[in-house]
Amino acid sequence: MLVGVPKEIKNHEYRVAITPAGVVELIKNGHQVIVEKNAGIGSAISDSEYEKSGAKILGTADEIWAQADLILKVKEPIAVEYPKMRKGQIGRAHV
């Protein structure tokens, strides 16, 4: 499964849905992980840390939403993200 992590865009939300350690676990279990550029910056996690863990960094949230089978977010999607959702795509967020 291709797991995607877009940067959180809800007001005052600076966390990221997965740490590099979580990326390692997903990859160990046969998944691939894509992370939006600077998604972890609010949690003091650099793109290079994600890359070292095995994730691929993509430039935009649109790329993440278009490719991922599973979207991981901290908060629920907001209205501007609704059109990006695809039929059959799975979303996981803490609400």
Say what each PLM segment does:
Residues 6-17:
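Short, glycine-rich nucleotide/cofactor-binding loops
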Residues 83-88:
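Short, conserved loop/helix-junction motifs that constitute active-site signature segments
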Residues 93-95:
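Conserved small/polar residues in nucleotide/adenosyl-binding loops
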